[in-house]
Amino acid sequence: MIEIKQLKGQKKYQEVTQLMNKHIQKMSENIKEEEIWFLEHENVFTAGSSTPKEFRIDEINKIPVIKVNRGGKITFHGPGQLVIYPLINLKKRKKNIIDYINSLEDICIKAFERSNIKLHRKKEKNRGLWAEKNNASKKIIFIGLRYSKGI
């Protein structure tokens, strides 16, 4: 069974990453079980693996920029924004990463439908979900994953 955890207060990105890495290591050793973490971060920009190599800025408007080992480009995290970290063993579940991302998007689509908010996908390369507002698509669900050792 997957344990759901809510980390209260605004968390430093680096501290959460350290905790997550320890948990994932223990999962790979079959010491820890799968968990899903819900939290808010202190203001931070993260620069994923698709960020251009020329991008060498340490902060934007006095907000730190941290290079991270997940897919995607630059993403802002901050107070009031819910961040969800599913620590799931895909190898054990016999799921590939594309099916997993599709499942995450499907869950979000169904959850938002309950509040009469219709979300849609764009092309396969551009993962995440969009909502329509004032005749314009606004991306409101961002998915940036790191996949290592089947987790």
Question: Locations of the language-model features?
Answer:
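Conserved, well-ordered active-site substructure
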Residues: 146
